[in-house]
Amino acid sequence: MAALPVPLPPTKMAAVEKRRPAVAPAANFPDSGRTSVSQAAAAAESEEDFLRQLGVTEMLRAALLKVLEIRPEEPIAFLAHYFENMGLRSPTNGGAGEPPGQLLLQQQRLGRALWHLRLAHHSQRTAFNNNVSVAYECLSASGRKKKPGLDGRTYSELLKRVCRDGGAPEEVVAPLLRKIQCRDHEAVPLGIFRTGMLSCFVLLEFVARAGALFQLLEDPGQAVADRRVGQAVLDTLEGALSAGDMATAPTHYLEAGSRLGPDNLARALDRAASGRRPSVPMAREEFLEKAAALFIAKVKPVG
């Protein structure tokens, strides 16, 4: 017969009960936990949806991609300028925030397109082409009184803005504009738009290099160069450009001009200096016009 357990005294029973861990009611903890988690998830989802609906998420993503694409020396200043220009009316927001004047809207479109075109140097081929496409979309967007697409009038106005802001004399760039402009009501496809913008930017750099070259030739006291020397340099430059006749891109002519080495230039200067008769001077404007004409002659006209 097994021995029965001896019951504990009341005082020991009370001590054992005190040592048992207290258990929270099962009905309270799970409900409060689920409520707090669900509220946090709902708040996070609501904030994310809010940013997505405003376009902030996509805007930040586009800004960071642009920094990676261009790799500016001062990324913070670049981003500040980027977001400042984002304040202009976006071409995809369907007319929201459209200014009262159609002319003002057109100027905003041109300013926005011009800003995109300047983000990357034309030598950064991929980044430049991407920015050209964005600029084309800015100008091609439809509005309340504008059909989608880019017309020749807007395209020609942007070409003039690029050249004017580039600092080149009007008489120097005018022959190029006459070759690549379109008629006012003519539809301008992206390919022509890209070639026209690239031609303008390359010409501006070409003229800047020609100006630096003229500084080496000119008499500091008179700000003119000997005509024989200037013409000899232009003839040598023309020969360097002729080597790029098989190239189709305007940048190839710029590269050909940069191959105007010191040896060829020195020989041209020696030949010019060997003449004994006095020569009339050549002004800077004339030299730049003739140098630009060498490049413009290689550009194919539109149409």
Curated annotation (Swiss-Prot):
GO MF annotation, one: tubulin binding
Known tissue expression: Broadly expressed at low levels. Highly expressed in brain. Present in brain neurons (at protein level).
Assigned keywords, A-Z: Cell projection, Cilium, Cytoplasm, Cytoskeleton, Developmental protein, Differentiation, Flagellum, Microtubule, Phosphoprotein, Spermatogenesis
Disruption phenotype: Male mice are sterile due to defects in the development of the spermatid flagellum. They have reduced body fat content and fail to attack each other when caged together with other males.
Modified residues (Phosphoserine): S46, S279
Gene3D superfamilies reported for this sequence: cAMP-dependent protein kinase regulatory subunit, dimerization-anchoring domain
Compartments (UniProt record): Cytoplasm, Cytoskeleton, Cilium axoneme; Cytoplasm, Cytoskeleton, Flagellum axoneme; Cytoplasm, Cytoskeleton, Cilium basal body; Cytoplasm, Cytoskeleton, Flagellum basal body
InterPro entries: DD_TPGS1 (IPR047502), TPGS1 (IPR039235)
Function: Subunit of the tubulin polyglutamylase complex (TPGC). The complex mediates cilia and flagella polyglutamylation which is essential for their biogenesis and motility. May act in the targeting of the tubulin polyglutamylase complex. Required for the development of the spermatid flagellum.
PANTHER family xref list: TUBULIN POLYGLUTAMYLASE COMPLEX SUBUNIT 1
Protein name: Tubulin polyglutamylase complex subunit 1
Gene this chain is encoded by: Tpgs1
